[in-house]
A protein has these predicted regions:
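Non-heme Fe(II)-dependent double-stranded beta-helix
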Residues: 1-60
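Histidine-centered active-site/metal-ligand motif
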Residues: 2, 50, 91, 140, ...
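Catalytic core of non-heme Fe(II) oxygenases with the double-stranded beta-helix
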Residues: 19, 43-122, 126-127
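A structural signal for short, well-ordered beta-strand segments
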Residues: 34-36, 70-72, 159-163
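Short, catalytically relevant binding-site loops at active-site mouths
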Residues: 38, 76, 91-93, 144-145, ...
Length: 168
């Protein structure tokens, strides 16, 4: 999208999007992926528990977990419209064992089994960031996350910039 849309191109290069990741990694970053994640009212899909870096490592051959996601809410995100759920601190464990699921969602995903999720949640709990349109969150590529289906009457559309250290 950032290659075809001037507004998305400006967003992808905006200092507020890029500088936190540059500061964290201590070097310039590049755009690994630019995604628009639309969870339509009443029928937005579920995304199973996973780590983005697991997919990037297995499918894209990204050598190290020096990557972050910047998520911008284009709609209000509330407890009803399928918000992201994070397991705090799970990124500190590095890449976890995962199984390749090619059928549940429209995108093949390396998913984490339920027993592992139970143990992680017992240790770190669960959080589901919510906020008005325009809110921004950053999360590490190894942070375990998922989202439920959107059965509410409200869309939940977000833009994701996946930024990676240039040395990676």
């Amino acid at each position: 999208a950032h290659l075809y849309s001037k507004p998305f191109a400006k967003l992808a290069r905006h200092p507020r999007m890029v500088e936190p990741t540059t500061q964290l990694f201590g070097e310039d970053v590049y755009m690994h992926q630019f995604k628009i994640n639309g969870k339509a009212a009443f029928d937005g899909d579920v995304w199973q528990w996973h780590q983005d870096y697991g997919t990037w490592r297995n499918d894209d051959q990204m050598p190290e977990a020096r990557a972050m996601n910047v998520a911008i809410f284009l709609d209000e995100v509330n407890e009803f419209n399928g918000p992201l759920m994070f397991i705090p601190g799970s990124h500190k464990l590095g890449v976890l064992d995962a199984e390749h699921d090619v059928s549940t969602t429209s995108y093949p995903l390396w998913t984490i089994n339920h027993d592992t999720i139970r143990r992680l949640v017992e240790r770190g709990g669960l959080v589901a960031p919510k906020g008005p349109a325009g809110s921004m969150i950053l999360f590490h590529g190894c942070l375990v996350h998922a989202s439920t289906a959107n059965l509410s009457p409200w869309n939940r559309v977000s833009v994701y910039l996946s930024l990676c250290a240039v040395s990676n």
